[in-house]
Amino acid sequence: MKNTTLIIFCTLTTFFSIAQNANQFYRKADSLYIIKDFKNSAIAYNEGIRLQGTTTGFIRYLSAASSWILANTPDSAFYLLNILSQNDKLTQSDYKNIESAKELAALQSDKRWKQLLAAVQKQADANTYPQEEFVYGRKDGMGLLMTQLKPKGKSNGKAIISVQAGSWFSNFTLVERGVYYKRQYLDKGYNVFMVVLGSQPRYAIPDQIEDLKRAVRYIRYNAKQLGIDPDHVGIEGGSAGGHLSLVIATADDKINVTASDPVDRVSSRVQAAAVLFPPTDFFNWGFPGAAMINVRGPQIQARVYGAFDFRVLNNTTAIYETVTDTTARNKIGKEISPIYAVSPDDPPIFIIHGDADMVVPLQQSQTFVAKLKEAGVTNKYIIKKGGRHNPDDMKPELDQFVDWFDKYLK
């Protein structure tokens, strides 16, 4: 048991998405910034950005530019920001953040500042697609939101649900950052629904599954108003989003025909799924018998404990109580592990997983695909050589997702 827990601990606490060398330079840059060695801080940031390449986030560029400004080297700050202004992941929020960033105030009197802002605005506009936000459900006095991204050209009338969840955290920032990865669908006429769920740590995985089912039903029920065909709905996601997508793809088609809300009287089934590096079996995490469902310490270290903090309402006290009974937790664990729900009537499923993934073991997709084959479910599986837990590592294979939906959402 000790060895099992240790392996799970090591797996869950590994860095998530970028090479450790880049992280080391960022940590060094942060430390140098604190002691006001701004020039060497900027140099360290630059090296981290160089190593991380095209996956470098907005905040790293901002930090590097800030250090160059404080080192009295505005030319280097403008150089970095001009690189950022050409980034095809830039959002409108990024533009607003650059425009108002106190760290960049010293550049605002420079004649190059307005040119920079214009370039950032132009790129952010080019990266944007028509969109509309909807409240797809309500709970605990709050609304559940989804954003419909619409193609700039003619719609093909088909829908792809994109599950916005990483480590079972879900928020609107993921929506903004995720538009870049949805271009392959939007440019071929798909409508993409970016679904935000009740997020951990407040809501656990079973709550998120119910939210996602509600989202599918909402889209299907309102298909005409949304401009899509209710019988051509696919689902996609990565990591936790991939896990939740597979839960939906393998779920049965139970419909509550007596539900008071008509939205809840329609199906939550999808017609195809495509996912990246998904967790599929919480009882065999990396190898047989490594159950992570009840290992609280490693879950806390990996910042996913809230996702497994199962709670039930005590109607007498009106208090949500944590489920601590092992038998009860194991029952829930099986219900949220899609590998145990695979059946011959499941829709076509496409999975890409890297063999260098140190967050979700490759074994999770291997055993799941074996189960799909055993059940006769149409599937496609790509093991990306050298691929880590990062969607950018999955290219160009990731671009095959749209072909999958083209084929199975006919």
Q: What is each model feature region?
A:
Residues 254, 289-341, 347:
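Mobile cap/lid helix-loop segments that gate and shape the active-site cleft of serine hydrolases
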Residues 203-224:
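Alpha/beta-hydrolase active-site loop
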Residues 217-292:
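Primarily recognizes the serine-hydrolase "nucleophile elbow" in alpha/beta-hydrolase
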Residues 199-200, 384-391:
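Histidine-bearing beta->alpha loop at or near hydrolase active sites
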Residues 156-167:
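Short beta-strand element of the alpha/beta-hydrolase
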Residues 119-154, 205:
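N-terminal cap/lid segment of alpha/beta-hydrolase-fold proteins
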Residues 345, 350-353, 357:
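Short beta-strand/loop motif that positions the catalytic acidic residue
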Residues 173-193:
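Short amphipathic alpha-helix adjacent to the substrate-entry channel of hydrolases
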